[in-house]
UniProtKB/Swiss-Prot annotation:
<keyword id="KW-0722">Serine protease inhibitor</keyword>
<protein>
    <recommendedName>
        <fullName>Ovomucoid</fullName>
    </recommendedName>
</protein>
<dbReference type="InterPro" id="IPR051597">
    <property type="entry name" value="Bifunctional_prot_inhibitor"/>
</dbReference>
<feature type="disulfide bond">
    <location>
        <begin position="6"/>
        <end position="36"/>
    </location>
</feature>
<keyword id="KW-1015">Disulfide bond</keyword>
<keyword id="KW-0325">Glycoprotein</keyword>
<feature type="disulfide bond">
    <location>
        <begin position="14"/>
        <end position="33"/>
    </location>
</feature>
<dbReference type="GO" id="GO:0004867">
    <property type="term" value="F:serine-type endopeptidase inhibitor activity"/>
</dbReference>
<dbReference type="InterPro" id="IPR002350">
    <property type="entry name" value="Kazal_dom"/>
</dbReference>
<dbReference type="Pfam" id="PF00050">
    <property type="entry name" value="Kazal_1"/>
</dbReference>
<dbReference type="GO" id="GO:0005576">
    <property type="term" value="C:extracellular region"/>
</dbReference>
<dbReference type="InterPro" id="IPR001239">
    <property type="entry name" value="Prot_inh_Kazal-m"/>
</dbReference>
<feature type="site" description="Reactive bond 3">
    <location>
        <begin position="16"/>
        <end position="17"/>
    </location>
</feature>
<feature type="domain" description="Kazal-like">
    <location>
        <begin position="4"/>
        <end position="54"/>
    </location>
</feature>
<keyword id="KW-0646">Protease inhibitor</keyword>
<keyword id="KW-0677">Repeat</keyword>
<keyword id="KW-0964">Secreted</keyword>
Length: 54
C-alpha cells in the first residue's frame, strides 16, 4: 500500500517538478505537493492510489 507523508502540508506554493501521483479520486496530481494540498483540503478523505499517472 503506497503512502505519502503529508505532515508538512499544506504549502502555499508548489514546485513545478513533475513526479505524478494518482489519487483515490482517479485524478493525476503533478507532484507530492499538489497531492498533499488536495489531501489536506479533503480532510483526509483523499488517499494515494499509486505512484505515476492514473
Amino acid at each position: 500500500f503506497a503512502t505519502v507523508d503529508c505532515s508538512d502540508h499544506p504549502k502555499p506554493v508548489c514546485s513545478l517538478e513533475y513526479m505524478p501521483l494518482c489519487g483515490s479520486d482517479s485524478k493525476t496530481y503533478s507532484n507530492k505537493c499538489d497531492f498533499c494540498n488536495a489531501v489536506v483540503e479533503s480532510n483526509g478523505t483523499l488517499t494515494l492510489s499509486h505512484f505515476g499517472k492514473c
